[in-house]
Amino acid sequence: MDDKHDVVIPLGIKSYDNNFEIKVAVASIKKYFKCLNRIIIVTQIQPIKELGDDIVWIYQDDIYKHDKDANIIEKVRVAIEKVPDLTEDFIMWSDDQFITKDTEWSDTRPRYMKIYNESTLPWFLGMAKARIWYKRLLKCFARFRNNGFGCRFFNPHIPSPFNKNKFMKMCESVPYRIETGITIYSLYYNFIGEKGVPNFDEFHCTSGELNWGGCRWVGFYNSSMRKPEFVEKLKKMFDIK
Protein backbone atom coordinates (compact mmCIF):
# COMPACT_ATOMS: atom_id res chain seq x y z
CA MET A 1 0.00 0.00 0.00
CA ASP A 2 1.40 3.38 -1.02
CA ASP A 3 1.34 6.48 1.18
CA LYS A 4 -1.79 8.62 1.08
CA HIS A 5 -1.89 11.50 -1.41
CA ASP A 6 -4.21 14.41 -2.06
CA VAL A 7 -6.07 14.88 -5.34
CA VAL A 8 -6.40 18.46 -6.63
CA ILE A 9 -9.10 19.18 -9.22
CA PRO A 10 -9.14 22.61 -10.91
CA LEU A 11 -12.78 22.85 -11.99
CA GLY A 12 -14.27 25.22 -14.56
CA ILE A 13 -17.85 26.41 -14.87
CA LYS A 14 -18.91 24.55 -18.03
CA SER A 15 -20.68 21.26 -17.49
CA TYR A 16 -23.09 18.90 -19.20
CA ASP A 17 -26.13 17.53 -17.39
CA ASN A 18 -25.89 19.01 -13.90
CA ASN A 19 -22.17 18.53 -13.19
CA PHE A 20 -22.19 14.91 -14.34
CA GLU A 21 -18.50 14.93 -15.31
CA ILE A 22 -17.18 15.91 -11.88
CA LYS A 23 -19.52 13.37 -10.28
CA VAL A 24 -17.91 10.66 -12.43
CA ALA A 25 -14.37 11.82 -11.65
CA VAL A 26 -14.98 11.96 -7.89
CA ALA A 27 -16.83 8.64 -7.82
CA SER A 28 -13.99 6.91 -9.67
CA ILE A 29 -11.40 8.41 -7.33
CA LYS A 30 -13.26 7.30 -4.23
CA LYS A 31 -13.84 3.82 -5.65
CA TYR A 32 -10.46 3.03 -7.16
CA PHE A 33 -7.73 5.47 -6.02
CA LYS A 34 -6.44 3.40 -3.11
CA CYS A 35 -3.87 5.94 -1.90
CA LEU A 36 -6.42 8.76 -1.55
CA ASN A 37 -5.97 11.24 1.27
CA ARG A 38 -8.41 14.02 0.30
CA ILE A 39 -10.08 15.47 -2.77
CA ILE A 40 -9.59 19.22 -3.10
CA ILE A 41 -11.68 21.06 -5.71
CA VAL A 42 -10.68 24.59 -6.71
CA THR A 43 -13.45 26.39 -8.56
CA GLN A 44 -15.77 29.36 -8.78
CA ILE A 45 -18.96 27.31 -8.62
CA GLN A 46 -20.84 26.54 -5.42
CA PRO A 47 -20.03 23.26 -3.61
CA ILE A 48 -21.92 20.27 -4.98
CA LYS A 49 -23.57 18.48 -2.06
CA GLU A 50 -23.97 15.19 -3.93
CA LEU A 51 -20.19 14.74 -3.97
CA GLY A 52 -20.13 14.28 -0.19
CA ASP A 53 -19.09 16.16 2.91
CA ASP A 54 -15.48 14.96 2.68
CA ILE A 55 -14.58 17.23 -0.26
CA VAL A 56 -12.41 20.29 0.42
CA TRP A 57 -13.73 23.26 -1.61
CA ILE A 58 -11.62 26.31 -2.42
CA TYR A 59 -13.07 29.29 -4.26
CA GLN A 60 -11.06 30.70 -7.17
CA ASP A 61 -12.25 32.58 -10.25
CA ASP A 62 -10.92 32.05 -13.77
CA ILE A 63 -9.22 35.45 -13.87
CA TYR A 64 -7.02 35.10 -16.96
CA LYS A 65 -8.27 35.51 -20.52
CA HIS A 66 -5.00 35.17 -22.44
CA ASP A 67 -4.46 31.44 -21.88
CA LYS A 68 -6.78 28.77 -20.51
CA ASP A 69 -4.05 26.81 -18.76
CA ALA A 70 -2.95 29.93 -16.88
CA ASN A 71 -6.18 29.58 -14.89
CA ILE A 72 -5.45 25.91 -14.23
CA ILE A 73 -1.96 26.74 -12.97
CA GLU A 74 -3.39 29.49 -10.77
CA LYS A 75 -5.95 27.12 -9.25
CA VAL A 76 -3.30 24.53 -8.43
CA ARG A 77 -1.13 27.26 -6.94
CA VAL A 78 -4.04 28.49 -4.81
CA ALA A 79 -4.60 24.95 -3.53
CA ILE A 80 -0.96 24.73 -2.47
CA GLU A 81 -1.12 28.12 -0.75
CA LYS A 82 -4.47 27.64 0.99
CA VAL A 83 -4.04 24.05 2.13
CA PRO A 84 -0.89 24.15 4.29
CA ASP A 85 -0.92 20.41 4.92
CA LEU A 86 -1.38 19.48 1.26
CA THR A 87 0.60 16.31 0.70
CA GLU A 88 4.09 16.92 -0.67
CA ASP A 89 3.23 14.90 -3.74
CA PHE A 90 -0.32 15.12 -5.05
CA ILE A 91 -2.14 14.26 -8.24
CA MET A 92 -3.84 16.77 -10.51
CA TRP A 93 -7.11 15.52 -11.92
CA SER A 94 -9.68 16.93 -14.34
CA ASP A 95 -13.42 16.38 -14.50
CA ASP A 96 -13.07 14.72 -17.91
CA GLN A 97 -10.93 11.87 -16.54
CA PHE A 98 -11.69 8.72 -14.56
CA ILE A 99 -10.13 5.41 -13.59
CA THR A 100 -11.50 1.92 -14.10
CA LYS A 101 -9.55 -0.27 -11.67
CA ASP A 102 -7.72 -0.20 -8.33
CA THR A 103 -4.89 2.32 -8.59
CA GLU A 104 -1.91 3.09 -6.36
CA TRP A 105 0.50 6.02 -6.50
CA SER A 106 3.05 3.84 -8.26
CA ASP A 107 0.58 3.60 -11.18
CA THR A 108 0.65 7.37 -11.81
CA ARG A 109 3.93 7.78 -13.68
CA PRO A 110 3.88 10.76 -16.10
CA ARG A 111 3.31 9.64 -19.70
CA TYR A 112 4.63 11.38 -22.78
CA MET A 113 3.21 11.12 -26.30
CA LYS A 114 6.22 12.24 -28.37
CA ILE A 115 9.70 13.69 -27.97
CA TYR A 116 10.16 17.00 -29.78
CA ASN A 117 13.20 16.77 -32.10
CA GLU A 118 14.18 17.06 -35.76
CA SER A 119 12.49 13.83 -36.75
CA THR A 120 9.17 14.68 -35.09
CA LEU A 121 9.20 18.38 -36.03
CA PRO A 122 7.08 17.88 -39.21
CA TRP A 123 4.39 16.15 -37.15
CA PHE A 124 4.30 18.94 -34.58
CA LEU A 125 4.22 21.63 -37.28
CA GLY A 126 1.40 19.85 -39.07
CA MET A 127 -0.61 19.60 -35.87
CA ALA A 128 0.05 23.27 -35.12
CA LYS A 129 -1.45 24.23 -38.48
CA ALA A 130 -4.60 22.30 -37.68
CA ARG A 131 -5.08 23.06 -33.99
CA ILE A 132 -4.35 26.15 -31.92
CA TRP A 133 -3.50 24.02 -28.88
CA TYR A 134 -0.41 22.66 -30.64
CA LYS A 135 0.74 26.19 -31.42
CA ARG A 136 0.66 26.81 -27.69
CA LEU A 137 2.60 23.61 -27.13
CA LEU A 138 5.37 24.65 -29.53
CA LYS A 139 5.57 28.04 -27.82
CA CYS A 140 5.82 26.21 -24.52
CA PHE A 141 8.74 24.13 -25.82
CA ALA A 142 10.50 27.26 -27.09
CA ARG A 143 11.08 28.34 -23.48
CA PHE A 144 13.61 25.57 -23.03
CA ARG A 145 17.15 25.02 -24.34
CA ASN A 146 17.88 24.21 -27.97
CA ASN A 147 14.58 25.78 -29.05
CA GLY A 148 12.79 23.05 -27.16
CA PHE A 149 14.38 20.07 -28.93
CA GLY A 150 14.49 17.21 -26.45
CA CYS A 151 11.31 18.34 -24.70
CA ARG A 152 8.61 15.79 -24.19
CA PHE A 153 4.96 16.25 -25.08
CA PHE A 154 3.22 14.88 -21.99
CA ASN A 155 -0.25 13.40 -22.18
CA PRO A 156 -2.67 16.22 -21.24
CA HIS A 157 -5.62 13.85 -20.76
CA ILE A 158 -4.47 11.75 -17.82
CA PRO A 159 -4.32 12.48 -14.06
CA SER A 160 -0.70 13.28 -13.29
CA PRO A 161 1.51 13.52 -10.18
CA PHE A 162 2.92 16.88 -9.08
CA ASN A 163 5.31 17.92 -6.32
CA LYS A 164 4.12 21.07 -4.58
CA ASN A 165 7.58 22.60 -4.04
CA LYS A 166 8.66 21.99 -7.62
CA PHE A 167 5.34 23.32 -8.87
CA MET A 168 5.76 26.55 -6.90
CA LYS A 169 9.28 26.98 -8.30
CA MET A 170 7.83 26.70 -11.80
CA CYS A 171 5.19 29.31 -10.96
CA GLU A 172 7.88 31.69 -9.74
CA SER A 173 10.06 31.13 -12.82
CA VAL A 174 7.49 31.21 -15.63
CA PRO A 175 5.39 34.39 -16.16
CA TYR A 176 2.26 32.38 -16.87
CA ARG A 177 0.02 35.24 -15.72
CA ILE A 178 0.96 37.34 -18.74
CA GLU A 179 2.51 35.05 -21.36
CA THR A 180 0.78 32.74 -23.81
CA GLY A 181 1.99 29.29 -24.78
CA ILE A 182 1.07 27.69 -21.46
CA THR A 183 0.34 23.95 -21.47
CA ILE A 184 0.46 22.87 -17.84
CA TYR A 185 1.63 19.26 -18.07
CA SER A 186 4.38 19.73 -20.66
CA LEU A 187 5.45 22.99 -19.03
CA TYR A 188 5.74 21.50 -15.55
CA TYR A 189 7.40 18.22 -16.45
CA ASN A 190 9.93 19.74 -18.84
CA PHE A 191 10.66 22.46 -16.27
CA ILE A 192 11.56 19.89 -13.61
CA GLY A 193 13.42 17.66 -16.07
CA GLU A 194 11.00 14.75 -15.83
CA LYS A 195 11.66 12.09 -18.49
CA GLY A 196 8.45 10.14 -17.96
CA VAL A 197 7.56 6.95 -19.79
CA PRO A 198 5.92 6.39 -23.19
CA ASN A 199 2.15 6.62 -22.97
CA PHE A 200 0.40 3.37 -22.03
CA ASP A 201 -2.68 2.02 -20.22
CA GLU A 202 -4.75 5.04 -21.27
CA PHE A 203 -7.71 5.54 -23.59
CA HIS A 204 -9.19 8.83 -24.77
CA CYS A 205 -12.81 8.92 -25.91
CA THR A 206 -13.33 11.33 -28.79
CA SER A 207 -16.93 10.38 -29.55
CA GLY A 208 -18.27 8.30 -26.69
CA GLU A 209 -16.47 5.02 -27.39
CA LEU A 210 -17.61 2.20 -25.09
CA ASN A 211 -14.67 -0.21 -25.42
CA TRP A 212 -11.61 1.16 -23.62
CA GLY A 213 -9.40 -1.86 -24.14
CA GLY A 214 -9.10 -2.60 -20.44
CA CYS A 215 -7.17 0.63 -19.85
CA ARG A 216 -6.86 2.00 -16.34
CA TRP A 217 -7.04 5.68 -17.29
CA VAL A 218 -9.87 7.03 -19.45
CA GLY A 219 -10.40 10.60 -20.59
CA PHE A 220 -13.08 12.03 -22.84
CA TYR A 221 -14.00 15.00 -24.98
CA ASN A 222 -17.21 16.89 -24.25
CA SER A 223 -18.71 15.33 -27.37
CA SER A 224 -18.84 12.00 -25.53
CA MET A 225 -21.38 13.49 -23.12
CA ARG A 226 -23.80 13.75 -26.04
CA LYS A 227 -23.83 9.96 -26.43
CA PRO A 228 -26.59 8.51 -24.18
CA GLU A 229 -25.01 5.05 -24.14
CA PHE A 230 -21.70 6.51 -22.92
CA VAL A 231 -23.42 8.42 -20.12
CA GLU A 232 -25.45 5.37 -19.10
CA LYS A 233 -22.37 3.20 -18.91
CA LEU A 234 -20.70 5.67 -16.54
CA LYS A 235 -23.83 5.93 -14.40
CA LYS A 236 -23.84 2.16 -13.95
CA MET A 237 -20.09 1.93 -13.32
CA PHE A 238 -20.13 4.51 -10.55
CA ASP A 239 -23.71 4.25 -9.27
CA ILE A 240 -24.64 7.80 -10.23
CA LYS A 241 -28.35 8.63 -10.16
Labelled PLM ranges:
Residues 11-22, 69-73, 126, 147, ...:
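Aromatic-acidic/polar surface patches that form glycan- and anion
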Residues 16-18, 47-52, 98-103, 107-109, ...:
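Short catalytic/ligand-binding loop motif for oxyanion handling, primarily in non-cytosolic enzymes
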Residues 44, 94-97:
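Short acidic donor-binding/metal-coordinating loop in glycosyltransferase active sites
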Residues 100-133:
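Conserved donor-nucleotide/metal-binding helix-loop-beta segment in metal-dependent transferases, i.e.
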Residues 3-5, 37, 86-89, 95:
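Short coil/turn segments at beta-strand junctions that form active-site/ligand-binding loops
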Residues 19-31, 62-93:
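A conserved donor-nucleotide-binding helix/loop in the catalytic core
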Residues 1-65, 194-196, 216-241:
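N-terminal anchoring/stem segment of glycosyltransferases
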Residues 132-224:
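Catalytic core and acceptor-binding pocket of nucleotide-sugar-dependent glycosyltransferases
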